[in-house]
Amino acid sequence: MKFSVLTLFPQLVLPYFEDSILKRALEKNLFELEVLNLRDFSANKHQKADHTLIGGGAGQILDPEMVENALHSVKNPKHTIFLSAVGKPFKQTDAMRLAQKKHVVLVCGRYEGFDERSIELGADEVFCIGDFILTGGELGALCLIDSIARHIQGVLGNAQSLENESFENHYLEAPNFANAVFKSKEINKIPAPLEYSKGNHARIKRLKLDLSKLRTKFYRLDLFKQHKS
């Protein structure tokens, strides 16, 4: 599995992979990472990366020829994703599906985004990470890589970590409680469910499913209504 990130700001992307789980996964060659500076593909001698809008309006958009040149430099086969607020919301099912791809390319928007022709000519999919605006697509790209990489075999030390996570069964994950003794009086005022400690895994599983549904109903009524059973 390989990820290629096309961005005007490589320095915003690379530090994320210098620690923790994804660093170890890279060191084990469980996936590859390539970060390309879009400016290197600008035809302008000053590496200008943007243009004004036809018809006027505030802001600039990314040079479509620069984006095209950058995409052409990335070898096929590849699955190209543009990060933009106009895209569909990224979901857990997308992460699971994309983890089966051999090469995912993520193109990070900036300024007012992309010339529409860049999307029409280059994008296999367009994603956003929520109904809000960021200054660029780098954070979105990192979110996607992190979410996808967790589904690559070996990245997580314990594959069972994926089984009961939020969204895996359409509901939010059930509440978790640390197996430890605490000095804090405030923490001890809220005991963990007794069933968690009794060792009956079938009953624990049923309780967690019930709590998972309650949590989903409280925090994400939209999801609860979609999958109520």
Swiss-Prot record:
Q: InterPro entries attached here?
A: Alpha/beta_knot_MTases, tRNA_m1G_MeTrfase_C_sf, tRNA_m1G_MeTrfase_TrmD, tRNA_m1G_MTases_N, tRNA_MeTrfase_TRMD/TRM10
- Principal localization? cytoplasm
Residue sites binding S-adenosyl-L-methionine per the record:
109, 129-134
Biological processes, Gene Ontology terms: tRNA N1-guanine methylation
Q: Give the location in the cell.
A: Cytoplasm
Q: Which domain of life is it from?
A: Bacteria
Establish whether keyword Cytoplasm is in the entry: yes
Q: Which reaction does it catalyse?
A: guanosine(37) in tRNA + S-adenosyl-L-methionine = N(1)-methylguanosine(37) in tRNA + S-adenosyl-L-homocysteine + H(+)
Report a single Gene Ontology molecular function.
tRNA (guanine(37)-N1)-methyltransferase activity
| Keywords from the UniProt entry | Cytoplasm, Methyltransferase, S-adenosyl-L-methionine, Transferase, tRNA processing
Binding partners and assembly: Homodimer.
Q: What is this protein called?
A: tRNA (guanine-N(1)-)-methyltransferase
The scientific name of the source species is Helicobacter pylori (strain Shi470)
Q: Which gene encodes it?
A: trmD
